[in-house]
């Protein structure tokens, strides 16, 4: 598996993407700006996005010219279609250990950071803390 840089103008969003991701793009852009582009966009052999539509929108908000991509050339068309859905759905199955999360956020709160975890979607009501 090789990570390649692809010009964002060459990437094609999947026309039937069932995910509504406009609300997440700004938070993902803030994450990319703060931590770097750590999760490549998955594309097929025709540069159509398999997974990573939100990351593409975030890259556009940041005016990036290119993004890291992985070509899923080891998957059949059927597997790509299934992976496109599975990749989004499986993350919804995870839950937060609220005690551990509060501890992590509390430790971050004690550090001198140039950002706030609310930049990445955390709500004070979700965690009961100062973020």
Identify the residue ranges that each predicted region occupies.
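Short, charged/polar connector segments at secondary-structure boundaries
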Residues: 1-131
